[in-house]
């Protein structure tokens, strides 16, 4: 299999789908995006590999790429790394969604004074998905100031894409499955979407998905050749992944990926060679139905 981006529409048509739903894509203010790309340009000393950005284009070109691929619903995920950033990032993401109907209204938050009010405001303005990045933000998900936020989002049934796995760079005391486990113990109905399948702690995050009915896992970068070098997925866990067909959603990390978008899809399709239950029905659920259900459509 050697899928190219030009082949992607034929790929999802073969599955009988009207397109793709990708819950882990990034659209950021230009200045912040340039800083993110600069970070990836310098990441080799931390992970041992270069990370060349595949889609280093302007915003209109990136939107056009999403549509050319047939991504019918995508997110504008952002994340704050310090106080007094989250509100403006949410404003940007919600404004983008207001201008582009295929962009899911997205928001973020940070453990700071007024966070509950910020999250409520985002919900009032139509936010359908939130994103936080504990590793970059350098905060513990269990911080007391966030407890009412988790309760609010659990009650609202709004998904939160959470990067709390220890990959690609561990942050002791901040990352790891125990942080999310602490939140879920208090808010068991939280719709938590674990980014990158929780890499590299795949098994521990599968434990949480098996224990809590609203924990989901996104496929972002998982199983790609690039990520298998950094955080290989234990083949012995594939049967457990297949046991949760309604709990896995497509994520890609577009545009900040070091390979064509199509490679994420072919990486998922080739899993059937090792676990036959990860078949076309599984791909349909992952690439369309599960994500659509989470965003309430």
Where are each of the predicted segments found?
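Mid-to-C-terminal alpha-helical segments outside catalytic/metal-binding sites
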Residues: 1-23, 30-73, 244-249, 258-297
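Histidine-centered divalent metal-coordination motifs
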Residues: 24-30, 163, 196
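Short, well-ordered alpha-helical microsegments
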Residues: 90, 115-116, 180, 201-205, ...
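Conserved, mostly hydrophobic/aromatic
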Residues: 24, 66, 93, 122, ...
